[in-house]
């Protein structure tokens, strides 16, 4: 699948990554209750996707980022993996045009990839397998619940 980041020309996109420039009015109008989560991800998508539904978002490959802090979180940890799953669920549940079926297919693939990494590391594979299967079951149940997506995040990520 094509990523706008690979474009050599100015192009429209549905969302922009975190290293983006925004009109001050968009940034000032952004409302999201602070969530005291230990790990947060997808803020760029959660912020920019709704704007992209109403306004034209452009990617300009001529604009270059000079410096970006390195991510310090252990992306292989269970906490980070669970956070990514719940934030993806939040995004899908807050954007009804998103497909739950595609979300599940993605979740299955990500879960299998996590298990493959765990198996290759040969450390705690069975406890990891139990963890991700339990997490997947929770994600499925929450997907069909009428629970408020923000409340799901608050309960699962604090």
Located regions from the model:
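Acidic donor-binding loop at a coil-to-helix junction in glycosyltransferase catalytic cores
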Residues: 17, 37-49
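A recurrent flexible, glycine/aromatic-enriched loop bordering the glycosyltransferase active site
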Residues: 3-22, 40, 74
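Structured helix-beta-strand junction loops
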Residues: 30, 53-54
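Active-site donor/metal-binding and catalytic loop motifs
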Residues: 35-36, 56-78, 87-91
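Non-catalytic, C-terminal membrane-associated alpha-helical segments of glycosyltransferases
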Residues: 78-87, 97-158
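Short glycine- and hydrophobic/aromatic-rich loop-to-beta-strand nucleating segment
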Residues: 13-27, 45, 57, 65
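Short helix-loop capping/hinge motifs at secondary-structure junctions, enriched
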Residues: 28-29, 98
